[in-house]
Amino acid sequence: VSVVPAEVLPGSALAVDETAAVGAAELGPRARLWPSLCAVYRAQLSRARVARIPLLFVATFQSIGIMILMRGVVDGGGEARAVVAGSSVLVVAFVALNLLAQYFGQLRASGGLDHYATLPVPPAAVVLGAAGAYASFTVPGTIVTAVFGCVLFGLPMAHLWVLVAVIPLAGAALAGLGAALGLLAPRPELATLLGQLGMSAALLLGVLPADRMPEVVRFTRDLLPSTYGVEAIARTFGERPDWAFVLGDLAVCGVVGFVSLAVATWAYRRAAVR
């Protein structure tokens, strides 16, 4: 006669206790936002380390070339300030808006969002980490462009420290917009097109002086988040900058950045569950 241990019998008390213990096992703690964001940020920096030099070369020398071309057209004064400020912010738009839209568009089309969905990181960390990494790529190019423009047009460089605030705030606004465009576009080709159109709008409406634009075009210019970064830089080139207006422009960049990154996070959640 074979003997069966009591603990393996379905109706035994031991089996019930073990089943309850397994069912009551707790999940691990949820990943916190800040450590997850830093991890995604470092991963994005490492991923793009090889492509960073040619990326900065293209973004920077594109803006420098535009300033050289405009040197023979613009005499000085407010027009020169607009050209230098617009060319500096264009570096941010090229990377944070254009390239980030392409990146998220390709990531969605290739199924890369499924990989991020399996990681124990909040959706906001993925969007903010990628946006922060792409925005940080623009720091050297923006500084070089602004300094070169000041030398080329004879503008003062005493207040270029305002770039410390303009780059992250304008970068957040444009990166959030680029991420949202890439995640909401149904096809990667459309995401690339939208990113290119956004960068072109930042170029044309940021470099050209606003007082020469028609009223309709000027209204469109006011809708772009890059405009307020351009205005903040351009105001500091004056003899006596009105810092209240500068802070107002930076505040608009910050609000638009918060809203655009929130929309991008929602778009990431929407795309990841499909």
Task: Tell me the role of every PLM-derived stretch.
Residues V1-V144, G149-F153, A165-A173, L177, ...:
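Hydrophobic transmembrane alpha-helices and immediately adjacent juxtamembrane helices
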Residues A158-H159:
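Interfacial aromatic-anchored transmembrane helix boundaries in multi-pass membrane proteins
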